[in-house]
């Protein structure tokens, strides 16, 4: 109930900010005084999110990586992990292709509107920072973890966190370390929950921040923001529809030789639950029941593959993040190259591991993407303000996509492994 109330509050704050901002923009009045008073309330929200994003990702990735199956699950566990990785990778690539195609924030009129934004930081400076060579990017992934934490080098933080979590999982199988590793993971889990509580507090403040950010953005740039909003929404929804109705069915048809739409019809209940609740955790019990009763999947695989998927598989989010990245690139004059797109895809896929259970997880991942683009705090605030406004709508589709991907993966691996009790 609290979550629904918060969503409603954020939506009302967004609409109120939009209306007030457009009225001020149409009135052609001097808004410098208004911006000076109201803007800090939005900046505080961005600052709090920036404060919490590194510990959230660091602890979540360690916990997520430490929970992946190792040799006790054998080939089946490996198949599940590989399937999740490949679908997330495909979703990130699809999202990038759609983002380039829709190109939100482009066009002469909008470029003129963004001109004042581009001047807030030297364009060539941003481009030189954001478009390093692929070799430079690869080397930076293995930076000293403490320096990476201090510098905000998210790729290095992600790589180290995943490696550390996997290492903990490996040494936990040795008798002399199993108890110590269990204790350490319990401490990490408690620390993660404490951080999540802070995230809840920040999200409770978010309606105020959303109102401030939205009203200032629309008061400054008016109708030029409507085009990007429409393109973003259409692009993300189109990508998710493509994943659910084209990509997943093709994967099942090719690998399993079954009618994929019969499978999708059987899982419509968890899909609808995910769409309505915007929560993979809320849909998980329904997914487990449907997997057992309707898809006839052995509990030996569904009991670990589905919970694991709700943690590490975020196909829907992998589609929408590139949209905001391209919008930011257009707004702030960042040149998009093959290298920068490759880094975007890699960062999106790696960062999604462990972020599924994070409150406002997609927003945290957006911060990573924008930080990686070397944008200034003011520029990040503008993009985050735009994202917060439509996040509740996009989140419904993304969560449905995530849950669908989890079940399709589980069913496909089970079918290939002979762990489906009845033939379709």
Task: Tell what function each PLM region has.
Residues 82-94, 153-161, 205, 309-320, ...:
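Membrane-embedded alpha-helical segments of transport systems
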Residues 53-57, 209, 279-287, 318-324, ...:
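Transmembrane helix boundary and interhelical junction motifs in multipass membrane proteins
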Residues 107, 322-424:
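Transmembrane alpha-helical segments and their short flanking loops
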Residues 7-11, 18-26, 30, 34, ...:
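Signature of multi-pass transmembrane helix bundles
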Residues 49-51, 152-156, 203, 238-239, ...:
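Membrane-interfacial loop-to-helix junctions in multi-pass transporters
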Residues 269, 275-352, 410, 420-423:
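Helix-loop-helix junctions within the multi-pass membrane cores of secondary transporters/permeases
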Residues 64-71, 107, 182, 221, ...:
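Juxtamembrane helix-boundary/capping and inter-helix hinge elements in multi-pass membrane proteins
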Residues 44, 80-85, 89, 163, ...:
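Transmembrane helix-bundle signature of multi-pass membrane transporters/permeases
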